[in-house]
Amino acid sequence: MSRTMSRLAAIAVFLIAQAGLVKAAEVKVFSTIGVQAALEELAPKFEQATGNKPNITWATAAILVKRVQAGETADLMVLTKQSLDVLTKDNKTTAGADAVFASSGMAVVVKKGAPKPDISTPDAFKQALINAKTIAYSDPAAGGASGVYFAKLLERMGIADQMKGKTRHPPPSGNSANLVVAGEADLAIQQEPEVMSVAGIDMVGPLPADLNNITAYAAGIGAGSQQADAATALIRFLHSPEAQAVFKSKGLKPADAPKGT
């Protein structure tokens, strides 16, 4: 009898261990670099809380959309709201009412210790761009939201041609603030959470409100995901007070938590 009980106990231990293994999952995530600094800090916290490990691929939202449309898949897409809407329309993702979890605007940075120009008004910002020897922003040809918007903004301000000869672009998925640190540009303009993640810069401030572009970040479950429950848990985690505190520290504005979370 004791041998039988021991065998049953061993089987029970094995089944419990297997149940624990089943619960833990690797969540494949495609994420825009706009929230990279925040998610790099939050991913291990989520894993510690749930046992589920996010495996994150970083790129611009535009690049990730192209990859998904070409046939790649992920359990969770963390993109700009505009990009997620494209994939949802194509039936590549499913986005719920809690899709949007944070937003951010664009900001200007200089090399650490360098003089900070006045950018408090649209006219002052325009003059700061004209006075700069070189500026850096994301290449609009790469499809990044901030680069596309800022190129159009230069046209709107009437200085696009004037800025062409003194504009530098980082490589795709790169950060324009790195060009400032390297001495290749006087000013860098990019999403605030992206430039805040670079060492060796000083924040000048956000673009004037009339010129700024607010980007919403959203998450959706990839079509055909085998880890939909774990991915859904990660979306809920992005609305938690712990996550919201991290977003604020990285230059993001947390979205209001949806009801029931």
Q: Which residues does each PLM region occupy?
A:
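Exported/periplasmic ABC-transporter solute-binding proteins
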Residues: 22-62, 66-73, 78-104, 110-261
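Bacterial N-terminal signal peptides that target proteins for export
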Residues: 1-10, 17-21
